[in-house]
Amino acid sequence: MSMGILDELDWRGLIAQSTDRETLANDLANGPMTVYSGFDPTAPSLHAGHLVPLLTLRRFQRAGHRPIVLAGGATGMIGDPRDTGERTLNTADTVADWAGRIRGQLERFVEFDDTPTGAIVENNLNWTGRLSAIEFLRDLGKYFSVNVMLDRETVRRRLEGDGISYTEFSYMLLQANDFVELHQRYGCALQIGGSDQWGNIVAGARLVRQKLGATVHAMTTPLVTDSEGKKFGKSTGGGNLWLDPEMTSPYAWYQYFVNTADADVIGYLRWFTFLSADEIAELEDATQNRAHERAAQKRLARELTTLVHGEGATTAVELASQALFGRAELADLDESTLGAALREASNGQVAELKPGGPDSIVDLLVETGLAASKGAARRNVAEGGVYVNNIRIESDEWIPQHSDFLHERWLVLRRGKRHIAGVERVGA
């Protein structure tokens, strides 16, 4: 079973680096291993980029090992050095609030029970918050060579630019100490993180060996980019794709993955789903021979939306996708799903219809950007290509009535088969 997890991670392409592979394999084979990954609360929510380490923890649990998900309530107040410069320090209350929210998200990805593989959630503020300056310098700092710390690539680049604060420079020590604490408390023997964390993770394994005389392991997963080299998990507007449905709607989340390029979708299925090799091979064949069906993309979107938001949200999103384009009933959508779907389908540009404002179909087509001019709008109507709530509009003098508004608030405008826009009635 334990050797199987490394084999599975290999074929899925999920191992970027690791400490001695043979020793790790032997230790995994000798019984359940406790494995951890840490997540700093640098925002109110985790984002899609966190999925790889999160799902890797889940894979270890399914293979018979015990996962620890660590919320960085302390390290989140410091900030891991990054290339773009010094981080803005958030208040302790803000970080605590974010850590609480993130903890709830972390708990969705692993199983909690009373078995030897039942997951644990920790917060490094529990031990770092009690660490005095003297203890930090004597019990941690003594084990770290400044020469080695300066050799870290991110630190080097920062020193070549505007420099780096001692606060961020010391981050490595605090993360390394997390490994010591988790080993002492739970026997944790493996830390997992993104490949940009390799230096910090190895430093932790080294500190465990130096302070406790124990051998522990380090493993990193690849940083995910698409076939064009762009960072994974960025929305159309360039922002993060958040796991919090209030920050990224389930509809927007689903649409991101259903629009995955053919060149990326099979890799994403390996990294982000628990589908078997045979199932993925079938979807790969479908992509190569029947790409127009987009079977792999639809399966990817369904798996990940269900994983993050639940089966009910996935069903609602798929119904919304069909309804917007005339393949299902708009009236069956709840208001929140309809509103989110409209905003996403129209790139966030939902026109407002105020009392007494221009409200003919011609005005609405121009206002929403579905027509460049009133003349173009009239031609679109005359050609039979304009729909409101999936009903074809026959006259360019059409004006919406109260009964036309879905949930007494929304109109769904469509030009042709693909161009969607929303109208929201306000102040009525």
UniProtKB/Swiss-Prot annotation:
GO molecular function: ATP binding; RNA binding; tyrosine-tRNA ligase activity
Catalytic activity: tRNA(Tyr) + L-tyrosine + ATP = L-tyrosyl-tRNA(Tyr) + AMP + diphosphate + H(+)
Isomerase in keyword set: no
Any single Gene Ontology cellular-component annotation: cytosol
EC class name: ligase
Subcellular location: Cytoplasm
EC number: 6.1.1.1
UniProt keyword terms in alphabetical order: Aminoacyl-tRNA synthetase, ATP-binding, Cytoplasm, Ligase, Nucleotide-binding, Protein biosynthesis, RNA-binding
Position of sequence motif 'KMSKS' region: 231-235
Signal peptide: none
Quaternary structure (record): Homodimer.
Function, as annotated: Catalyzes the attachment of tyrosine to tRNA(Tyr) in a two-step reaction: tyrosine is first activated by ATP to form Tyr-AMP and then transferred to the acceptor end of tRNA(Tyr).
Family: Belongs to the class-I aminoacyl-tRNA synthetase family. TyrS type 1 subfamily.
Entry protein name: Tyrosine--tRNA ligase
